[in-house]
Amino acid sequence: MSSKAASFVRFTVQEGKLEEVVAALKDKAPGYRSLPGVLSLTFAQTGAQEIRSCAVYDSMASLETNGPALKETLASVISLLAEGGFERAVGEVVVEA
């Protein structure tokens, strides 16, 4: 099994705010991606008002250490999300191709 960890976030965006959220994520993502232990960061639009992200870290410790930086990175989009529009799951990477 890998020692890498991944974080998956589902963002449900308020009606009419999708472009603003995408712009904010594009602005903030490079800074977060450059943090120690962050191996990759991807965002995809998965619905009319939904974006999902996947961040892969070199370890669960790196995922946990970068938690405050993730909160800071996402602070600019939280007000643009629908009520209950942020759902996060984390886990250990078990298959990598």
Model features per residue range: what roles?
Residues 1-6, 10-12, 38-52, 75-97:
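Glycine-rich beta-strand-turn "strand-cap" elements at beta-sheet edges
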Residues 6, 25-26:
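A generic structural signal for ordered secondary structure
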Residues 12-23:
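Short, surface-exposed ligand-recognition loops at beta-strand->loop->(often short) alpha-helix junctions
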Residues 15, 48-51, 59-63:
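Short, charged/polar surface micro-motifs in flexible loops or helix N-caps
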Residues 19-21, 53, 63-65:
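Short acidic, gly/pro-rich beta-turn/loop elements at beta-sheet edges
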Residues 27-39, 56-89:
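An amphipathic, aromatic/His-enriched active-site/gating alpha helix that lines ligand/cofactor pockets
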